[in-house]
């Protein structure tokens, strides 16, 4: 029975899904952003964030054995040695002051031709990016009444200045 399976199966076997996520993670680490389907991007996000957390933990370890163990765990997930090397040497530094939320997903406009799959762009969040913050102020409400018109005296004064200006130019 399929009780409490909170993971997108992506319509493939377990081995295929692991290999696909590994390849997508390697491409994301190598290039910084990739274009894929929305469902794959949503499945990739927690996978990549766990690997980045392992890289951050390895950098914080003083014992080299523990750091090597975390590196090998990441290597077993990503399976691309150059991507893991880049992650552990360069990429993790961008996320030193960030606790989670290392990736961002943008939905792209039109669906893919052929199978009408929703496309998305997944990318790393930059170190200096503050991210989206909800405003804590009150929401703007619509005015209940119409705006009051300007007083007739103010309108007459504005009209007089516009009429007087062309008259001065003619002299």
UniProtKB/Swiss-Prot annotation:
Coiled-coil portions: none
Keywords: Ribonucleoprotein, Ribosomal protein
Keyword set includes Ribosomal protein: yes
Signal peptide: none
Entry keyword annotation includes Ribosomal protein: yes
Any single Pfam family the record assigns to this protein: Ribosomal_L17
InterPro entries assigned to the protein according to its UniProt record, in alphabetical order: Ribosomal_bL17 (IPR000456), Ribosomal_bL17_CS (IPR047859), Ribosomal_bL17_sf (IPR036373)
Positions with biased composition (Low complexity): 150-165
Basic residues composition bias: residue spans: 133-149
Gene Ontology CC terms: cytosolic large ribosomal subunit
Residue segments, region Disordered: 130-171
GO MF annotation terms: structural constituent of ribosome
Domain of life from the UniProt record: Bacteria
One GO BP: translation
HAMAP family: Ribosomal_bL17
Family: Belongs to the bacterial ribosomal protein bL17 family.
NCBIfam families, per database record: L17 (TIGR00059)
Complexes and interactors: Part of the 50S ribosomal subunit. Contacts protein L32.
Protein name stated in the entry: Large ribosomal subunit protein bL17
Organism, scientific name: Opitutus terrae (strain DSM 11246 / JCM 15787 / PB90-1)
């Amino acid at each position: 029975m399929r009780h409490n399976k909170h993971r997108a199966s992506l319509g493939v076997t377990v081995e295929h899904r692991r290999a696909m996520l590994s390849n997508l993670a390697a491409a994301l680490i190598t290039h910084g952003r990739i274009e894929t389907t929305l469902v794959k991007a949503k499945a990739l996000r927690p996978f990549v964030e766990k690997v980045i957390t392992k890289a951050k933990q390895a950098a914080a370890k003083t014992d080299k054995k523990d750091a090597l163990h975390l590196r090998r765990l990441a290597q077993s997930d990503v399976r691309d040695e150059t991507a893991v090397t880049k992650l552990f040497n360069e990429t993790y530094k961008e996320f030193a002051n960030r606790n989670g939320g290392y990736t961002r997903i943008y939905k792209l406009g039109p669906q893919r031709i052929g199978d009408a799959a929703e496309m998305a762009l997944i990318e790393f969040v930059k170190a200096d990016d503050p991210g989206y913050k909800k405003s804590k102020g009150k929401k703007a409400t619509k005015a209940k009444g119409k705006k009051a018109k300007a007083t007739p005296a103010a309108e007459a004064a504005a009209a007089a200045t516009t009429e007087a200006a062309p008259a001065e130019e003619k002299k």
